């Protein structure tokens, strides 16, 4: 019985740490709100040292710093008392927001954790819209340059 319980907990933990397509889609749509016509999943994944999964080293430019700040924001979310481990992981939790023009508003209906994560994504999307995109940092050899 203990082995069955352990297996169930490990499976739940592994599932909670996988990235939810819906959560990624929300962040993508926020970026599209601030940068209409962009292709966020193509453009910003594997950019510099921090944009995409993981991140380490020194950011290569301002856009990469936006991603580093976003990563740190997610790390802070995981430490919040209102964000319950397994349930409110920033990579899996979804939230409510609206986009009007290029303005993003996180919904008052969000709980504290959802609001924090929403604002992490909102601030990153705004940051992306204010800095240049340097094609030479797309698919950067992170082992060499980070």
Curated annotation (Swiss-Prot):
It holds the Pfam family Phospholip_A2_1. It comes from Mus musculus. Residues 1-15 form the signal peptide. The active site is at 70, 121. This is Phospholipase A2. SMART domains: PA2c (SM00085). Activated by trypsin cleavage in the duodenum. Can also be activated by thrombin or autocatalytically. Its EC number is 3.1.1.4. It catalyses: a 1,2-diacyl-sn-glycero-3-phosphocholine + H2O = a 1-acyl-sn-glycero-3-phosphocholine + a fatty acid + H(+); 1,2-ditetradecanoyl-sn-glycero-3-phosphocholine + H2O = 1-tetradecanoyl-sn-glycero-3-phosphocholine + tetradecanoate + H(+); 1,2-dihexadecanoyl-sn-glycero-3-phosphocholine + H2O = 1-hexadecanoyl-sn-glycero-3-phosphocholine + hexadecanoate + H(+); 1-hexadecanoyl-2-(9Z-octadecenoyl)-sn-glycero-3-phosphocholine + H2O = 1-hexadecanoyl-sn-glycero-3-phosphocholine + (9Z)-octadecenoate + H(+). The lineage of its organism: Eukaryota, Metazoa, Chordata, Craniata, Vertebrata. Keywords: Autocatalytic cleavage, Calcium, Disulfide bond, Hydrolase, Lipid metabolism, Metal-binding, Phospholipid metabolism, Secreted, Signal, Zymogen. Induction: Up-regulated in EPCAM-positive intestinal epithelial cell upon helminth infection. Up-regulated in intestinal epithelial organoids in response to stimulation with T-helper type 2 cytokines IL4 and IL13. GO terms for cellular component: cell surface; extracellular region; extracellular space. Ca(2+) binds at residues 50, 52, 54, 71.
């Amino acid at each position: 019985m203990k082995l069955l319980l352990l297996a169930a907990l490990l499976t739940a933990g592994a599932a909670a740490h996988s990235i939810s397509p819906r959560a990624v889609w929300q962040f993508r749509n926020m970026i599209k709100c601030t940068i209409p016509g962009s292709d966020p999943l193509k453009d910003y994944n594997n950019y510099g040292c921090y944009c995409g999964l993981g991140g380490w080293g020194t950011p290569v430019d301002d856009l990469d710093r936006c991603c580093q700040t976003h990563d740190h924001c997610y790390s802070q979310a995981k430490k919040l008392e209102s964000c319950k481990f397994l349930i409110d992981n920033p990579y899996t939790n979804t939230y409510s927001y609206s986009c009007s023009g290029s303005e993003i508003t996180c919904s008052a209906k969000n709980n504290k954790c959802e609001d924090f994560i929403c604002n992490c994504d909102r601030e990153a999307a705004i940051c992306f819209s204010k800095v240049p995109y340097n094609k030479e940092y797309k698919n950067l050899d992170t082992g060499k340059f980070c």
